[in-house]
């Protein structure tokens, strides 16, 4: 795992390397941050391009594509799952039993659930390692003036789903572009901003909503909660960058240099605490980078599942496999009059 360690270390050291991780996370947003980094590491070790669309051997076959002879699998971490039946016992407690087992007397069946019981390695292949039927993958050429309000509404819907109202105002706290008030469950966005800027600010504030509430125990553990405001800002801005990038909006180089400075500050504080009152092993820079990447990608995925950007998020099953490119107006191979293509035909070698 030296390669993975190196990727995370560089991400802490260099804003450009952090941006590369975020760009990959935007393309592969259906994957966890850890798996994105794993895929990037393995492709880099082979001297090939970054992964764009990955799937298992049989999944590629279902879409009319075959893995090229001699290609070696990429590996990601996948959950082991088990189906169980949840029952409510007479004393009010809940109990889970294997599906098919007899429930205790007096128990009320509450239905079946899928539980994660462990983790395993799963072999996948990038589209560049396959050949066969072209995959027609929608992509964004940037949001139009019509699409920006739709993005805004879907982002506001995420806020409402978490119990926050969204206000566009010229008089919010500190006259900042955006502000999240956890006490009032309210997100405020500057009324002087143009529609695209408002969407960007709202995406940033959603990063705070999803990651930095008063019960953010993971953030406190790794120094990225509101107790370490600079690193919390890096997380929120990274969420905004990833979400907007997935929608075809490039926010430019991120200020990931903050990550290095705040990671060092957290480590120094933990070293001091460890020498006085705590026996906890201080976090390393890579531990902090791993935590931030995982939190950012998890929050981004939750948002993107609602905003539904073009593309497949790096996973194949939702792709349309077809020998016919013609007639698909939103796919590559067809350029509507006076308009650029808004799709990508991936056909491999």
Regions found by a protein language model. Give the residues of each.
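N-terminal accessory/interface modules of nucleic-acid-binding and processing proteins
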Residues: 1-347
């Amino acid at each position: 795992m030296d390669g993975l360690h190196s990727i995370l270390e560089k991400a802490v050291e260099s804003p450009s390397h952090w941006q590369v991780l975020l760009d990959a996370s935007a393309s592969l947003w259906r994957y966890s941050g850890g798996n994105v980094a794993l895929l990037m590491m393995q492709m880099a070790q082979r001297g090939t391009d970054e992964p764009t669309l990955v799937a298992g051997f049989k999944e590629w076959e279902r879409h009319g594509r075959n893995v090229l002879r001699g290609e070696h699998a990429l590996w990601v971490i996948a959950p082991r799952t088990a189906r169980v039946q949840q029952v409510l016992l007479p004393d009010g407690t809940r109990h889970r039993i294997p599906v098919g087992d007899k429930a205790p007397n007096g128990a009320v069946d509450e239905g079946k659930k899928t539980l994660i019981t462990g983790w395993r390695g799963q072999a996948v292949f990038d589209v560049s390692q396959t050949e066969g039927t072209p995959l027609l993958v929608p992509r964004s050429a940037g949001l139009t003036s019509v699409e920006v309000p739709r993005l805004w509404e879907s982002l506001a819907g995420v806020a409402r789903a978490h119990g926050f109202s969204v206000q566009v105002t010229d008089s919010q706290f500190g006259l900042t572009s955006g502000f999240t008030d956890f006490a009032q469950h309210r997100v405020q966005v500057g009324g002087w901003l143009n529609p695209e800027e408002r969407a960007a600010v709202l995406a940033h504030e959603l990063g705070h909503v999803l990651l930095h509430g008063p019960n953010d125990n993971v953030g406190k553990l790794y120094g990225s909660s509101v107790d370490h405001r600079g690193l919390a800002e890096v997380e929120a801005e990274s969420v905004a960058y990833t979400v907007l990038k997935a929608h075809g909006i490039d926010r430019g180089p991120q200020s990931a240099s903050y990550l290095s400075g705040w990671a060092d500050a957290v480590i120094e504080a933990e070293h001091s605490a460890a020498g006085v009152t705590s026996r906890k092993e201080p976090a390393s820079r890579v531990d902090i980078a791993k935590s931030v990447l995982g939190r950012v990608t998890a929050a981004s995925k939750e948002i993107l599942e609602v905003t539904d950007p073009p593309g497949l998020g790096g996973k194949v099953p939702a792709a349309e496999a077809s020998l016919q490119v013609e007639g698909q107006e939103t796919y590559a191979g067809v350029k509507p009059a006076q308009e650029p293509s808004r799709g990508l035909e991936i056909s491999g070698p």
